[in-house]
Amino acid sequence: MPKKTIANLSRADVEGKRVLVRVDFNVPLDDAGNITDDTRIRAALPTIQDLISKGAKVILCSHFGRPKGKVVESMRLTPTAKRLSELLGQDVVMCDDCVGASVTEAVNKLENGQVALLENLRFHAEEEGNDPEFSKQLAANADLYVNDAFGTAHRAHASTEGVTHYLSPSVAGYLIEKELNYLQSAIENPQRPLAAIIGGSKVSSKIGVIETLLEKCDKLLIGGGMIFTFYKARGLSVGKSLVEEDKLELAKSLEAKASEKGVQLLLPTDVVVADAFDANANDKTVKIEEIPDGWMGLDIGPDSVKLFQDALADCKSVIWNGPMGVFEFDKFAKGTEAIAYTLETLTGKGATTIIGGGDSVAAVEKVGVADKMSHISTGGGASLELLEGKVLPGIAALDEA
């Protein structure tokens, strides 16, 4: 069911009202406590600015890191408040907690169009426990609720699900709306041919996605460490490459299912192997039938890149989730980089390209083509679960349109 969004709220609906907005400000920091990538903060700006312009009192809440229910000084949201103030061009009131009298006092002082940021939700264990009393306390300082944290929408926490029982309306922000539009339509109503590129090291973490995509897509391209489980299932020798021994039968059944459904399932034909898992290891490119004993595959080879590029050439929609190799090591990043450039070209020709969260986002950013993609998902696990066709609790809890 479509959900009510912030776009459905008029100025009259929110002016002078206290609006609790769940955002995802779980941003990376360096050792000195500086934000190294503010993408997630910038992603929430359209929703925040819309509420400011409509005269709302904006109360932002987010988790940061994994403090496990206690106050950890290095996990305070102070650096985030500072960066957000710079981006908005106005002071953001930083609260010293997310519930309680001090928060009520700070919120009561807000003028229309002002913004407050509550302290890290996960300083309270009740947040992840979706505790009703904590949800009620969180909701007590607000009149209505907006969820714009797609990255945590697959979790039923107090700030994503619990508060919706006490605040009405509860609606989706612009970021969640965009995520749903792209990810759901890519699966339910794509321009064809639809290709999915699935990478990463483990078949086990991508089983659900591969199974769902086999029902929906025309071509499925598989790269990353999981290819060796498929090769071993075919009876090939894979040296010291990563293999999930308990998933060999599954790999066979996925290949069988693809051919039964008429889905073109492509695996690399050559790989870059190394004699150690190391950025400076000795490396060579070999055909998949010729992986030497004691060596491990860490990237797809140039022939495979060409094979994948040819398969993608006529595609109108492409979903990419997971790198082709160990792209953190420059020596083994070529396959992943080539796919990123290929998608850039396809987008330029009118294809819809969706980067489905996690490491593939880091990859397109590293290559510098992130802004050339149709859509970059901000959720890792949430994107995967949505692509798997699962119901996300944080979305299900919102009002229906």
UniProtKB/Swiss-Prot annotation:
Pfam families: PGK
Subunit-level organization: Monomer.
Catalytic reaction equation(s): (2R)-3-phosphoglycerate + ATP = (2R)-3-phospho-glyceroyl phosphate + ADP
Record GO cellular component, one term: cytosol
Binding residues for ATP: 206, 297, 328, 357-360
Gene: pgk
Organism: Gloeothece citriformis (strain PCC 7424)
Kinase as UniProt keyword: yes
Source organism, top-level taxon: Bacteria
Main location as per UniProt: cytoplasm
Pathway this chain belongs to: Carbohydrate degradation; glycolysis; pyruvate from D-glyceraldehyde 3-phosphate: step 2/5
Keywords associated with the record: ATP-binding, Cytoplasm, Glycolysis, Kinase, Nucleotide-binding, Transferase
Name of the featured protein: Phosphoglycerate kinase
EC number: 2.7.2.3
Subcellular location: Cytoplasm
